Amino acid sequence: MNGNRVVVTGLGAVTPVGLDVASSWQAICDGKSGAASIEGFDTDAFSTQFSCSVKNFSTEGYLAPKDSKRMDPFIQFGMVAGIQAIRDSGLEITEANCERIGCAIGSGIGGIGSIERNNELILNAGPRRMSPFFVPGAIINMISGNLSVMYNLQGPNLAIVTACTSGTHNIGMGARLIATGEADAMLVGGAEMATT
């Protein structure tokens, strides 16, 4: 890829082995596994009873409780990692540069847990019981959308969905937008929470 030089200036991570970059990296270096018994639902009927899910996660210090309550966990993970990356970068977003800074964060499956819960709610209690926040709390582009609103990112805003490679494709797209001069900075990545 020719054009402007692309560099990484900030990192964020919410993983099965840590809730930020430092703790995740240390756990990886120490050879720790994120695999553990699945919590949150009965797994007796399933042959697999473990997953590599995020543990002990909280949005405290990142999102208002009212806002995080309306978000599927994958959005919470992506939001927290994105906030960490912005903080780590030291990037100052101003009225002068906000139109040149964008966001590209995707997910392979999005809010599958929210979709399952709302389907059950509709079947058991009827459609009027479904929350009006269901769709914005479960669709894949809401990580990019919410972070763009939070930080006034007015540049390119997208969420590429390509299954397990969604995060990689969003990182690549961000690099391409910078290299071609369509953006000066991009907040990029992926998030997932499919243990349901």
Which residues does each PLM region occupy?
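ACP-dependent fatty acid/polyketide chain-elongation machinery
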Residues: M1-D67
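Structured loops at beta-to-helix junctions and adjacent beta-edge loops in soluble globular domains
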Residues: L11, G106-G108
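Acyl-thioester C-C bond-transforming condensing/cleaving domain
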Residues: N2-G3, P16-L19, C29-I38, S68, ...
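A glycine- and small-residue-enriched flexible loop/hinge segment at structural boundaries
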Residues: G40-L91, I140-Q154
